[in-house]
Amino acid sequence: MEESNEPEALWIPNNNYFPNRNGYKPRYIIIHGTAGFTSAVEVANFFKSTEKGDNPVSTHYIIDLDGKLVQCNSESDGAYANGGVSEGHDAWWSKSLNPNLVTLSIEHVKLSRDNSDDIPDMQKEASFLLVKHLCERHNIPRRWANAEGGITGHYSMDPIHRSFCPGPYPWEELFAYLNTEK
């Protein structure tokens, strides 16, 4: 049994992933909102319940409203987190490469079904620290994503079905934090 890559994270694994990323390395961090759910454990258990279904889903990390972390898949594997790339996506996404093979995904518990709520301070602090650690561990650029990698929201690859994912997120604060915390 594996353990969490992030020391503070509760490990609630599932089998919804691509083992060893089919040889690819993570180049992007994708920020998501849960669009409902009340806790990270509830989200992790939902993902686990989809293991043998028609639409298995997962993520690497889930950040609760109070900043507690849950990890569902190893960073060395590609989580079933992003679906496909839709029309209108940012130019660097390849329609021929599954984005899950090159991304690390972080879900943020959001109570609203439309992801319209802001993230509270404890969740924001945990998110910023986790993004920093992921950038350090995987040499991901600490900036907005482009063809070489970086950080963006789910909307970047699927503006049709995920146009409001993650919803409000303190992007400018994140990049300021990442570029002062080296």
Spans of model-derived segments:
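N-terminal catalytic cores of peptidoglycan-degrading enzymes
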Residues: 1-99
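Conserved beta-strand scaffold positions in the cores of enzyme catalytic domains, especially
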Residues: 60-62, 103, 151
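Basic/polar, cationic surfaces and motifs that engage anionic cell-wall
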Residues: 1-8, 23, 101, 109-182
